[in-house]
Regions:
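Contiguous alpha-helical segments
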Residues: 1-53, 58-62, 66-103
Length: 103
């Protein structure tokens, strides 16, 4: 195992309680796409596409799925609050493409 692989495996274990093999299994099960938007990760750092983020419940630490950066940040901004997410959904449904309130 290279030092890069060791470091990656160590971080998965420390941060999420999973190893690299479990991450790869999740990645393959999800066919390499985000569990929410069903798109592959596109965000890059220094020209390299980053890995899908390991999404987890911040209260329990339980790993949920792999998400792209945008979806992971969105859940974070909503603090994983289902009611706030439902309100955001209602808000979007109640406004048409012209931005006029229709509800």
């Amino acid at each position: 195992m290279s030092s890069k692989e060791y470091y990656r495996n160590h971080n998965f274990k420390r941060n999420y309680g999973i190893n690299t093999e479990e991450y790869v299994t999740m990645f393959l099960t999800q066919q390499g796409v985000c569990a929410i938007c069903k798109q592959p990760e596109t965000f890059t750092i220094k020209g390299k596409v980053i890995n899908l983020a390991v999404d987890h419940d911040h209260e329990t630490g339980k790993v949920r799925s792999l998400l792209c950066r945008n979806c992971n940040l969105a859940l974070g901004y909503f603090k994983d609050d289902v009611e706030n997410l439902q309100e955001a959904l209602r808000y979007l449904k109640n406004h048409n493409s012209n931005g006029l309130f229709i509800g």
